């Protein structure tokens, strides 16, 4: 009986030491993506995915490049077209501007709004930004933290440059 108990404890110890088994995420961040099979009767088309970023928590360029690689979960999908790249980041106080490649021109207005909402929510969680502007080619969309709602009444301002 002692031998069986020792073997069981050894197995539990080994399993807890395996990556992804029993270990908590040390430096988690939440990236927001589109729910793959979103249906209109659902509350929100956006869901968060927790990711490990040990050592890079304060490196926004790294985090956004990591974000643009897309989600790990099969239940989520990137609302931005494949190949979208980070072109620039600038922050003045609580206003953050993210410039991405012009791949967003392939999206219709609602798709672009959803993509910008996901990226804005991610940025607001990573920084102290209260307003996030996403620029893609000639399109631009600004979200403020106090009026970012995930419903048909998204308070956003789209401009053409």
Where are these regions (language model features)?
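Bimodal "functional hotspot" detector
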Residues: 4-8, 20-161
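Hydrophobic core
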Residues: 9, 13-17
